């Protein structure tokens, strides 16, 4: 899906949500910390969900 090509967006908020995003350069789902607001679709709660949607 095209959401897998979107850049990682931490957002301006300062909450601490461990999430995963698909890194289009490496072709892998990678952990990052999401701040809690103004993110995009390339933001998954689990590694499994990221891999399932982005086929990593």
Curated annotation (Swiss-Prot):
Family: Belongs to the venom Kunitz-type family. Sea anemone type 2 potassium channel toxin subfamily.
Residue ranges annotated for the BPTI/Kunitz inhibitor domain, each copy included: 4-54
Principal place of residence: secreted
SMART domains attached to this UniProt entry: KU
Cellular-component GO terms for this entry: extracellular space; nematocyst
Subcellular location: Secreted; Nematocyst
Function: Serine protease inhibitor that inhibits trypsin (Ki=73.8 nM) and chymotrypsin (Ki=993 nM).
Name of this chain's protein: PI-stichotoxin-Hmg3c
Modification after translation: Contains three disulfide bonds.
Residues carrying the site annotation Reactive bond for trypsin: 14-15
Coiled-coil annotated residue ranges, if any: none
Keyword annotations of the record: Disulfide bond, Nematocyst, Protease inhibitor, Secreted, Serine protease inhibitor
GO molecular function: serine-type endopeptidase inhibitor activity
PROSITE patterns noted in UniProt: BPTI_KUNITZ_1, BPTI_KUNITZ_2
Organism: Heteractis magnifica
Further remark: Does not inhibit potassium channels (Kv1.1/KCNA1, Kv1.2/KCNA2, Kv1.3/KCNA3, Kv1.4/KCNA4, Kv1.5/KCNA5, Kv1.6/KCNA6, Shaker, Kv2.1/KCNB1, Kv3.1/KCNC1, Kv4.2/KCND2, Kv4.3/KCND3, hERG/KCNH2) and TRPV1, the capsaicin receptors. Does not inhibit the serine proteases plasmin, thrombin, kallikrein, the cysteine proteinase papain, and the aspartic protease pepsin.
Disulfide cross-links: 4-54, 13-37, 29-50
Pfam families: Kunitz_BPTI
